[in-house]
């Protein structure tokens, strides 16, 4: 008798081979050629099982991909996995994919090259089992998640609005699901003054604004406004004609996002020092993702499917944002952390726990089957 769990376990070496191929491609968010190469590898793999790829081309960033089976009609489940990493050109040459016992290493191995393997093989497993559930999914493989999904946000939200739920394949820290995430945004403030020995200081104007911006931080509410980068001036003995700052914002709720956004724009709408001029750009790029009753019901289904195969799944709130922030904002229940288990994302020590590949592939396949049978 054919066994789903057994078949998936037998595919572990194939999954690792795909992961090695993907890891050994430099695909930092701004490396378009590398990301598109990753996209070509994945679209080729999906084509082998009759999934069609719709390419959303971009000039500077990698092309986003929308993938579904050629016989799919109004699929209800959205799967999202990003193809970019935080690592620059040449990283792979210095530390390519490697394996040591139950662990695999390499740039982006857990965040999130391994998730592409578990996703592909979950769909293959459903096909092998005779299920039709693989026709009920649509995948967005985006290319800029690590820099805020600014270019892919419109596509994600557009597709999400046609779905009943979203499953985000970010890696699972300690095996936990993610049910909530902070929102965030980035702003850039430029200040123009006048250069002279007795001119109008752009740096002084910026300094006054920084104090007001930092005063927006409210730790009890989970609001953090931080000016993390500043620059300005031309020499130590002249008044600075120009200064600029980069501002990072983290918020707990949608409402706080609106409040902080308005406050930042108000602070930067006028000059403290006569003769200076301010330019502000940016916004809340990721709305906060808060747990809803619909998402709790989705968690219940996922945890039940995990328990059937010995996985005790907990869910937690995470500080960093992901594409689940966008799908939740679009109005559909969303759960994150469905990828394989690993840790140290964005670090040289990043790793994948190899035994989790089969476990998370089986979990994803069973969840898709369960959601498709309702």
Specify the residue positions occupied by each region the protein language model found:
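Secretory-pathway/membrane protein signature
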Residues: 1-13, 49-51, 83, 184, ...
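Acidic/His- and Gly-rich active-site-bordering loop/insert found
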Residues: 1-105, 128, 324
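Zn-dependent metallopeptidase/amidohydrolase metal-coordination segment
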Residues: 7, 230, 311-371
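Generic non-transmembrane alpha-helical segments
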Residues: 7, 11, 18-25, 41-49, ...
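Active-site metal-coordination/substrate-binding segment of hydrolases
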Residues: 74-138, 147, 353-354, 358-359
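Acidic, glycine-rich active-site loops and adjacent beta-strand->loop/helix elements
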Residues: 83-85, 103, 140-147, 169-173, ...
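Midchain, well-structured core segments that form catalytic/ion-binding scaffolds
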Residues: 145, 150-294, 300-304
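Active-site-adjacent substrate-binding region
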Residues: 210-218, 290-335
